[in-house]
A protein has these predicted regions:
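Short, positively charged
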Residues: 1-56, 60, 69-236
Length: 236
């Protein structure tokens, strides 16, 4: 059901064009992620599916929206990303990676001491990520980048300005608009942090270039016969 919710919502938005619909207001324009205005007779199978590199699924009144169905499986917020790519994002948003290095170091100590498992909830007393207001605000900036602006590999050519979260694509009263402050605050209580191996890590690690290895190494540990060092963030 959830996987069809996004095209159904876009189809509904097109039918509502020219009307005032809360929480969006007056809908004057509904376009694809790359700005092509949808025609009134658009069929669902003709709705443009955004590429994985795009952060927006649709443009409403010239603004980019990422669509999130509550009925679909929760998507990853940050998908198995190694330290070198987090460092790229830190450089883009103008932050030092040092606070994140500290959080990851604490995570590994807690995990090796068996106080936490691979997954740690943001609500856990042992969660080192965002364990104080300063860390949460630091993470807000980083996580917002992944939600709205790009990935560890690159800036998106199609960033989003808002998230349109919904339960039923046909009932506007179930829709909610999230911006860069409200999105993080809404997701934070449900966030799960993990450091994993199979996904995100180079398959030939540690036999990689010395330049890349030195950037990745601070997060990597050899546990259960595997090198683990990619940080994954999702909601539950």
């Amino acid at each position: 059901m959830g996987e069809q919710d996004e095209p159904r919502l876009i189809e509904n938005l097109v039918s509502l064009r020219g009307r005032h619909v809360e929480p969006l207001g007056d809908i004057t324009s509904v376009a694809s992620y790359n700005g092509v205005e949808y025609q009134a007779d658009i069929q669902r199978n003709r709705i443009w599916k955004a590429p994985t590199s795009a952060k927006r699924d649709v443009m409403i009144n010239g603004k980019g929206y990422s669509l999130k169905s509550i009925r679909a499986a929760p998507p990853a917020i940050v998908n198995h990303t190694t330290r070198d790519k987090w460092l790229r994002v830190c450089n883009v948003v103008g932050l030092s990676i040092d606070p994140l290095d500290e959080m990851v170091s604490e995570y590994w100590k807690l995990r090796i001491d068996r106080k936490i498992g691979e997954d740690v909830l943001s609500s856990s007393n042992y969660c080192p990520f965002g364990s104080n207001p300063q860390r949460r605000e630091y993470l807000r900036t980083l996580i917002n980048y992944f939600l709205f602006d790009g990935t560890g590999a690159q800036d998106s050519a199609y960033p989003a300005e808002y998230i349109l979260e919904f339960t039923d694509p046909l009932i506007p009263s179930t829709w909610r608009i999230l911006d860069k402050r409200s999105a993080f605050d809404s997701m934070w209580p449900k966030m799960v942090f993990s450091i994993r191996s199979k996904k995100g890590m180079p398959p030939d690690y540690p036999s990689i270039s010395a330049t890349k290895k030195v950037l990745m190494e601070p997060w990597v540990r050899h546990i259960d016969s595997d090198y683990r060092g990619s940080l994954h963030i999702r909601t539950r």
